Design a protein with these regions (language model features):
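N-terminal, positively charged nucleic-acid-binding surface of large information/translation enzymes
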Residues: 2-198
C-alpha cells in the first residue's frame, strides 16, 4: 500500500527525456563518401559473377510514400548482403517516366489541358516536370540511404529502353507467351482510358 509520502513525491517527479538531435548532415557526408568511392557502382570483372537485382522503376511523381521506402529498403538489404559476401551487385535505379500520372500532374501544375495543347509542347512540359521530380526523388532515395547505382540510372522513356522492351515483347510473342483475352480493367471516366492495377 502506498504511503502518503510516496504519493506526494511521485506527484513531484516529472520525468524528462533530454532530446538528442541527430545531425542529418552527417548522413549526407557518409553518403557522399560512398558515392565518391563508387561503393554502389558495379565494377565488371571484379568479384566474380555479378548479382543483379531487377528493380521495378517507381513512377516519377516527386514524392515517395512510406510503402515505396519500405519496398526499396527490402531490395536494398538484399543488395547490401550480397556486397558483404564480396559479390559485385547491380542495383539499378530507374524511373517510370510514362503514363497518366505524369500527364495529370503537368495539367494541374501548368494549368493546361493535354488535349488543348500542341503535342510537342505538352511533351516538353512533361519532360521538364519529370526532370524536376526525378531530382526530388533521387534526393529522397539518397536520404534514406538506398545503395543503388545512381550513375547508371535508366528511364522508361529513353529510346534504348523502349527498344529493349519492344524486342523483349516481340521475342515473347514469337514463343507464344503473349496472349490476348478479355478481362475486367480499371477505367477512369475523367481520363477516358483504362489505368494500371498498381
Amino acid at each position: 500500500m502506498a504511503t502518503p509520502e510516496k504519493t506526494e513525491s511521485a506527484k513531484k517527479f516529472l520525468p524528462r527525456i533530454v532530446e538528442k538531435r541527430w545531425d542529418h548532415h552527417l548522413e549526407a557526408k557518409i553518403f557522399d563518401q560512398w558515392q565518391e568511392e563508387g561503393t554502389f557502382t558495379v565494377k565488371p570483372g571484379k568479384g566474380g559473377k555479378p548479382f543483379v537485382i531487377d528493380t521495378p522503376p517507381p513512377t516519377t511523381s516527386g514524392t515517395w510514400h512510406i510503402g515505396a521506402v519500405a519496398s526499396y529498403s527490402q531490395i536494398d538489404m538484399i543488395a547490401r548482403s550480397q556486397r558483404m559476401q564480396g559479390k559485385p551487385v547491380l542495383f539499378p535505379i530507374g524511373f517510370d517516366r510514362n503514363g497518366i500520372n505524369v500527364e495529370i500532374y503537368v495539367e494541374k501544375q501548368s494549368k493546361v489541358k493535354m488535349r488543348d495543347t500542341p503535342r510537342q509542347q505538352f511533351i516538353d512540359l512533361c519532360s521538364h516536370a519529370l526532370d524536376e521530380l526525378e531530382g526530388q526523388m533521387i534526393n529522397m532515395m539518397k536520404r534514406v540511404g538506398l545503395s543503388g547505382d545512381y550513375d547508371g540510372k535508366y528511364h522508361t522513356d529513353h529510346e534504348s529502353y523502349r527498344k529493349l522492351t519492344q524486342a523483349t515483347f516481340i521475342e515473347l510473342w514469337k514463343r507464344g507467351l503473349i496472349y490476348e483475352t478479355t478481362r475486367p480493367n480499371n477505367y477512369c471516366h475523367e481520363c477516358g482510358t483504362t489505368i494500371a492495377d498498381a
